[in-house]
């Protein structure tokens, strides 16, 4: 869900004085400046970086690339505003300690009550050093901070000495990571020039923080453990007063120890890693250090980690393990593996397979027990690395469970509903096990917008993947009675227009008792009927277009599933919905839409069916939009100043119309916010941090794990991979994002909007929220990928691979079993009806045999098979029909694919 236009306008008054105009910063001026800026700064130049520290605090005031000094990794434009107590800067420290044996903790922060530090003499590689006692409020320990260089790289070190006569336990030790992710009042151009995104690998001694520029180009800044600084936990710094919003996610800190927090603020929540503490005896000293290095590019992060002597892990396909589809894990480090521990015990099985020519250790990881699982690898030098998996059901079972839950638990059948929402698949609260039939934000209960439409969208998209006659019968009722005619106008001036919500708040016009007294309706989101009936929000149109399109596919490709209307009728409605979006919602239609790829799929089907007049009109409207994007440096706006969902459509149309430069810009921008990290929650997880506010139950600004952006951004990533099958990185992040749509589905089929990353929660959100937009991404994009990697050998993503006598066999494990890509031949096979069981490939002859599923679950009379144009393959013994299909009768069990002469 997005902001209303009135609030949007407040956000996009882009000007250099924007910060000063913010009421918060005006108010903060009344607070005393405690960070002395007047005393100046010290400047330093390293091999690749230039940086400055304030003389008064020795905190970082600038961090720049040596060859690009216009860009600063720090929030430099806010330095003057943030020169007050409680504002964190890079170089600060948070400590929570207690005398050994005491039960209560005491917290000390160098930012809380800012005082000038005591500079000390430098020696050797030490660039600046200070005693932090004045700014740590009478802490009983001595804390010395130093900035150092190590072979041209920057090191931040804290040396802590127990100067008392009693032992002290350090229960939390955090180093704030203050980089410039604040986009307040910035245009898209200035944000991409100035700002960064950062994501953690919470992997203990192998952990790191990656800091990428928004445009995805140039080097990636990595923060690494240098000494005694394992990445144990990642805490949001909500005590920093900088206001969090749709343009500022907030800052976080790198936690080396976290025991005190797990006993207090995070009590009862199972953390990613086991919490630790450190006891310092009287007179004992311990040093903690982080190092900042540059990887040449995002794709070269792992290469740089190896150069820096860090343990590196690569999962293939990743860290979500379906129970029917074991994964491979490749590990490389200078030291031998001493042991691998699994928690919970037995949750996964780990089997060593050998090593590669490049000395990567290879393992097979099999998922046994549903839920989170952690591997802790201990190396011979006692360094530890944690790798975070989640074991899930098979893709087929998850999607089956999802469809059942949506069309049963979420099925809303109430003929007396005054808002006309019955029958439908409605928003659901998993914590109360109830339908969300009213809410202070109208769209939650209104069957439109993302949080309202997502559930019925997921239910309909599920039928594209796994058609189920009983579910389809219910959804046909919804489409005929509720969607087409209520959510979407089917006649009159607004014909084909899509409303913002069927639910609205007008107590004077409806019977007493319609609205609950326990809900606060004094909010901007409690829309009136007029507001709810508005058809000017373009983002509501792709949901409806996708529903019409799926019904077209079901009516066209299956003989008995959908017969109420002709396939032509459904395709016409899908086409008209795309036209209506541009004509009735032109303001927001200028932006890329979430699920906007649906209009390309509709266009291709119009062409396939010979409906050339409609195809020409739709293509013309879409080209006008793409031409507009071509004129922009970064066409990634939306209702928000910056967004991560329009890139899906921007990329596909730019690619379609041959705007290759804009497609490349879009792809690089996606890679900036979709990380490849050995953690199921972050790997492939597209950045989003505000939709818990507009589509969640626990509403707060927070990095969301596998929000719908994961699977939507996977569409361009995997499309780009099929164009460039040597780019293994694209496959890794694209497949991980695709699987993100299944990551958070519960064992009984409930699908939340996203997973909460806050260490105080680490759980699914309580309602369905925006989930369906992500499942759309899985439905249209999921596939099996087969590659021969130059280092790791033959691999299958969403498939079980075996090799016999040089021949390859892959059993297909996606939910649809309808798409497979053989990278070596750039062979892309898709089925619009029917299912694949396996693919067999002989590299010597290049022949490919497809075994077709004999299962009746596909409900298809014929297998409708397509082969991508780039491979040069054809189906032996069959010719394409007018629609481009190889039509294979259902009784045929296998077909042979051969290269065309």
Labelled PLM ranges:
Residues 334-401:
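Extended acidic/polar, glycine-enriched regions
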Residues 22-133, 144, 181-261:
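Acidic-aromatic substrate-binding/catalytic surfaces of carbohydrate-active enzymes
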Residues 21, 133-143, 149-207, 383, ...:
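Acidic (Asp/Glu-rich), glycine- and aromatic
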Residues 278-296, 892-897:
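Short Pro-Gly-centered flexible turn/kink motifs
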Residues 299-321, 620-624, 628, 647, ...:
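Terminal, non-catalytic domain-edge segments
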Residues 402, 406-711, 716:
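Catalytic cores of extracellular degradative/oxidative enzymes
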Residues 183-187, 304-325, 385-427:
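Low-complexity, Pro/Ser/Thr- and charge-rich linker/hinge segments at domain boundaries
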